[in-house]
A protein has these predicted regions:
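Fe(II)/2-oxoglutarate oxygenase catalytic core
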Residues: 1-107, 115-138
């Protein structure tokens, strides 16, 4: 999405978002007491922005993010919420009976595998924006 930002500004934003997402890998490892389970070398896939339109049924149905050979290198998913949508637009984890409320700056990190099907719920009065990406094996 280009809102008039220069190429230099866009690169700076991209670099900062990438750095922020990658820094959460260490926090994730600390929170889960992971020491050697994740690869020592990995990369971040391209960063994507998803817009959920207001007052619609715009949503992502229950799914997993690793479902074929092309996506099989993914081992962590990242959602950086850019907007607050109180009581709507949650990310729901079906088997965990868990809903994550979108709040600006909140980063959700989880394995994108079959154990963690999730859905992006529709929003009501206001649009929802998230930045998403994946860590993958090199």
């Amino acid at each position: 999405v280009n809102s008039g930002a220069s190429t230099a500004q866009s690169k700076l934003i991209h670099d900062n978002v990438t750095k922020t997402l990658l820094s959460t890998v260490n926090l994730y490892m600390i929170d889960l007491s992971i020491t050697n389970e994740l690869p020592s070398q990995y990369a971040l896939e391209e960063v994507r922005i998803k817009k959920y339109d207001a007052n619609r049924t715009d949503q992502f149905a229950d799914h997993v993010d690793v479902g074929d050979h092309n996506s099989a290198r993914r081992f962590l998913a990242f959602f950086l919420y850019l907007t607050e949508n109180q009581f709507e637009g949650q990310t729901n984890f079906t088997y965990l009976d868990l809903s994550i409320d979108p709040k600006p700056g909140r980063i959700l990190v989880f394995p994108p595998l079959w154990l963690f099907p999730h859905a992006g719920m529709p929003v009501g009065k206001s649009e929802k924006y998230i930045v998403g990406s994946y860590c993958h094996y090199l």
